[in-house]
From Swiss-Prot:
Name of this chain's protein: DNA damage-binding protein CMR1
Organism lineage string: Eukaryota, Fungi, Dikarya, Basidiomycota, Ustilaginomycotina
Gene3D superfamilies: YVTN repeat-like/Quinoprotein amine dehydrogenase
Region Disordered, residue ranges: 1-91, 144-168, 482-508, 525-549
GO MF assignments: DNA binding
Organism: Mycosarcoma maydis
Family the UniProt entry places it in: Belongs to the WD repeat DDB2/WDR76 family.
Residue intervals passing through the bilayer: none
Any GO CC annotation of this UniProt entry: nucleus
SMART domains: WD40
Classification via InterPro entries: WD40/YVTN_repeat-like_dom_sf (IPR015943), WD40_repeat_dom_sf (IPR036322), WD40_rpt (IPR001680), WD_repeat_DNA-damage-binding (IPR050853)
WD repeat intervals: 185-226, 255-295, 297-321, 361-401, 431-470, 556-598, 602-637
Amino acid sequence: MIESNDYEQERLKNIRENERLMKELGVMGGSSTIGGPSSKRTTPTKPKKQATPKKKPDTTPTRIMPSRSSARLAGHEADSETLKRKYEEEAEEARKVAEAAKRARHQPFDLSGMTGGELEEEAIMALESTLQGLANNTSSAAELVDTKDENKRRSANKPDPQFSTERRELEDILNKMTLKSAAKVTPKRIYSMAYHPSTDKDLVFVGDKEGSIGVWDAAPVAFASNRNGVKTADDQDEDAEERFPEGKAWTLQVHARSPVTCIKFDPVNHNSVLSSSYDSTVRKLDLATAKSEEIWAGEEDVLLSIFDVLSPSTHPSVYMDTPNPSLDERSMWIADHRGGLLHIDLRERTRRGNNTRRWQVCEKKIGAMSVNRLAPHCIATASLDQHIRLFDVRALASVVKQTADAPYNYKGVDADDLESAQTKAQFASSKARQACTSVDFSPRGDQLVGVSYDDVVKVWSMEPGSLFSEHGLKNRIATAKSNKPKGAVKKQVPDSASDTGPGLLSWLSRATPLGTKKDVAEAIKQEQDAPSPSLSKRPDDVLANPTRIPHNNQTGKWLTLFRAKWNQNALLEPHFTIGSMSRRAEVYAADGTLLRSLWDENLVTAVPAVTCMHPVLPARLVTGNASGRCTFWSPDP
């Protein structure tokens, strides 16, 4: 206690001594008197004007799963059987909902059913007005092929395409192409695309990963920054992608929640949009009535890869009463994931399941297929077994056994049926080092382009008159003899006709359709009496010596596989388009020359895996990527 008092007295003594010294120095005011830090003087500043935030549509995703909650606060034990059972029931319910969404919808739908009632009345009216009258200014297949000049092109020596007039004209118009509009058309990854043949509108139909078909009117709409037409500071700070024209886009739920693998227009009526999906159905969207209906359905577990429909102006046999699977204009060919080719006659009322004619032509999945326009009995396939094959479907119909039930996998394929198809109906094949993903015939029928996963694009040149198999040729001769009336005298046809196929080009060159039964009978007889091509004139290997184009095709898991597509206007210099891993859309000539590479550093930030061109007008290209975004390129006026 005494020590603490001594300490306190010493402390107080020091305080008094310090105060005395500070009084003598005159600094009793503390640190403020001796120049210590003082508070800063605040000068009034002009208040900063806050930028008015731009109103954006609410894009907050709807939460599907329930909100997280505490099981402890709810009174559940950590290893409660009741809680486990609850979670299992919720998972099972979610699985059933997902499976039901992927299950095919066989009923017809109107516009409100395809939009789910989410579109406003004004948007629906705008869509209906866009779809009306699209087929008024479209061109038929016969108008796109100048067949009288085609014989001269085949017989004459072709000049070097580097110096040809057609090549220079094509390069000139391709070099004028610029990006006109860009927009998000579908909610998910784009799988397929088709350009409407109308010359009045740039209307594109886009299929995505979950059964939606986006309708995009790609015509650019002028951007208005504000009501007065004067850009403000806020407008200048906006991203260029938001200011860029987008056109108009609508989304229709045509199929179930499965990828739309192929979209094509009916060659008879361009107001009908045909589409296939992994839900194993083919549906028709009527643009005039804005209704969708199913036209064919297969087995639920057999996925559809691609299809093609024969054009009525390809041959006169469309007028025959008996459907011919190689020449009927209402014939649809479908390739599936089990290695099968299916033939459908659209005039048949029953078009479901095992009633369809099917042939097992490949061991594994067929990823792509194309029907030759000038030789419709020839079908090219690209499959997972690393082959591109050419088949004569006349031999399929006559000597190859049909396989109504698709095998579950490649182990269930009947070896005898497969060997019969590949030895009797197949007449050419080309093997790649890895899987083949794309194949497409040119509109002139004399060139074929294929894409494979070994980073190469191949282009073959061929004569349509040499695209046949021995058994297919025998079938044609037998059919002609059986259909020929007694006492008929064979017409003398010039030898040059045999070089281009049995009456196909002459049929295409007709300016007027056949109006009477007599004209129809004469046209059919002319095709039947045409001299048959000879096996001795056909090359030993039709798919030999292709033009090889190095191309990175490693799209991986999250991108749609690249597909090379020819421009369908046969009057132009042959050229095709394909996507690129360098985020460019590329245009190639038939000889492998890169004619144009399209890219915009500000607006194209993803790989444009899917491409398509206008079938009539030159240099009009649309691309699509994995986010559902499309770009539209066309020449400057």
